[in-house]
């Protein structure tokens, strides 16, 4: 298995879409993304590790994000590009290769960049493990997420805007 650890640092997006942490994906059939703080929140203790593992039909996405405000909820998305620069704007919108609508993770018609919202426990840690059947780690696949940004947003997801 090829495990590659990549990280990127980004600053704040425009006021309503500030990033808490960001990382870029690389490698396959399993890849580990290290989330590191952005300049959006100072000081910013947000850090995390997310593993994407290829399955026969989809990808297992599992990991842990630390340094969140206890009890807080955060939007969590795969973005179009793997660049977290230019105040986070370089990552583009949510990954959406089929032009689907923005909605909840695994809901019919939802776009491929949608991941479950992160909810921090009393210690400020969000742990998750889900099967995502809308993404792939396969070269050439339209829904391949390798090389894209993984973003923990400062605020909760409204399931409408990007």
What kind of feature is each model-predicted range?
Residues 2, 6, 15-162:
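N-terminal leader/targeting pre-sequences
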């Amino acid at each position: 298995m090829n495990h590659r650890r990549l990280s990127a640092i980004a600053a704040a997006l425009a006021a309503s879409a500030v990033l808490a942490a960001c990382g870029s994906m690389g490698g396959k059939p399993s890849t580990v993304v290290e989330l590191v703080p952005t300049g959006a929140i100072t000081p910013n203790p947000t850090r995390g590790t997310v593993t994407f593992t290829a399955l026969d039909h989809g990808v297992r996405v599992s990991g842990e994000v630390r340094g969140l405000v206890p009890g807080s909820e955060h939007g969590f998305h795969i973005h179009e590009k793997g660049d977290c620069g230019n105040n986070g704007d370089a990552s583009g919108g949510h990954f959406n290769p089929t032009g689907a609508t923005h909605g909840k993770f695994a809901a019919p018609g939802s776009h491929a960049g949608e991941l479950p919202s992160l909810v921090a426990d009393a210690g400020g840690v969000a742990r998750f493990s889900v099967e995502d059947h809308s993404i792939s780690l396969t070269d050439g696949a339209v829904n391949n997420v390798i090389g894209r940004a993984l973003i923990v947003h400062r605020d909760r997801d409204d399931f409408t805007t990007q």
